[in-house]
Amino acid sequence: IFILSCTASKNTFGKKYEILDIDSLGSKSYVAAIRNIDISEFKEGELKKENISVKYRLFSPEVSSKSQKFPLVLVFHGSGAIGNDNTKQMYALVKNWITPENKEKYPAYILAPQFPIRSSNYHLDPNRNVLASESNEHLDLVLQYIDSLKKQLPIDGSRIYVMGFSMGGSTTMNALSKRPDLFAAGINISGISQFDKMEDLKNIPLWYIHGSLDTDNSPKSNLQFFEEMKGNGKIFFWDCKDKWHNNIASKELIDTIPKWLFKQQKK
């Protein structure tokens, strides 16, 4: 275990890092400012198939040449944003991508679906004695939409990323497990892992983040996944000390996400 401050690199595969938020007051104000960013630049839409539907918002970067291609970032929300107002899912991990600095340094399509029901449900894995997650047809609809977007928009198919918080972190692992061919990397923040497709994920860069004091989603599931995957996969773990479920966001985390994702590319 490595205990590091903000100044050191913390992204070596196979390593677990204890993260100390040394400027918690500054982090809170920084995250609060991002939460207040206007979302009018995101186009509203709705996906429908048979008896299911999923609303979404999509941000498109500024295209300056026909040859330009951009990453796509899929961001899943937690259970507190379940609904159909197409607004509650627009939390800091979505809005961070459209700060003036990030729009310039990390231009990307940002897709933020809002699920009308839980996108992941949990059950006890009897072999591991930890929770495991599983998804439903609403996730399938979103993944099919990405296939459609790839044909319509100048998306770089080697740089499609998926990330999420809480239930969204779980759904991130469900999406990777369903479509390992689609994604270049994934970030699971405070979610619950899926264990039955681990072999398919060993070549996908994974970043796990969890608060050590989290009682909403115990870190046990993600720690178990990390321990099993660290020897032959591409995964590293941020163990955020003295963080619980709903205060996991920090300036360091939010700043590091686009930097790390943009370095990942499918070969």
Regions found by a protein language model. Name each.
Residues 6-72, 170, 223-226, 233-235, ...:
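A domain-start/cap signature at the N-terminus of enzymes
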Residues 65-67, 123-165:
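Gly/Ser-rich "nucleophile elbow"/oxyanion-hole loop immediately N-terminal to the catalytic nucleophile
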Residues 68-70, 84-88, 121-125, 174-175, ...:
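Short, solvent-exposed loop/turn and secondary-structure capping segments
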Residues 76-78, 210:
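The conserved beta1-alpha1 loop
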Residues 79-139:
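Active-site machinery of serine-nucleophile hydrolases
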Residues 106, 201-206:
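Short, proline-enriched alpha-helix->beta-strand connector loops that line the catalytic pocket
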Residues 147-152, 158-202:
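Primarily recognizes the serine-hydrolase "nucleophile elbow" in alpha/beta-hydrolase
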Residues 189, 196-197, 205-209, 213-267:
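C-terminal catalytic histidine-bearing segment of alpha/beta-hydrolase fold enzymes
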